[in-house]
Amino acid sequence: MSDFADMEALAGALLRRVDAGERGKILRVMARTLRSSQSARIARQQDPDGQPFAARKAQPPGRLRRGGTIKRKAMFRKLRNTSNLKAGSTDTEAWVGFSGRAARIARVHQEGLEDAPAKGAKPVRYARRVLLGDTEAERQALLDILFAQLVKA
């Protein structure tokens, strides 16, 4: 086992000893922090491993196309808003995920699936862009938060 796995096991054991109300507060802080870091990483257009997202496919030129201003902007600008990227917790778990229609869009990109870009359009295979995932830095930050909150409690 790595040192990190040992620390996670210790953190889990310590967290189970805290009463449910306090544990819920700690997990809520952890979920919000994780949501914030996931949102920032999506804004940087990076996968959890640090690689940039796969670029958009080039569109064929046409006379009905606009100047391409939308395509030059960052992908997933609205997906990372708090209205779409949700964080929550109970007294036993903390979670971060997408809600509603955004969840469907995110799933297609997360797994590199095929989807129709518009109603009645031919399905297109999207490149795999990992929107949600943990990094070593995020895991370390969550452990730091957990230990800081346990010291306060």
Task: Give the role of each language-model region.
Residues M1-A153:
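Short, Lys/Arg-rich flexible segments
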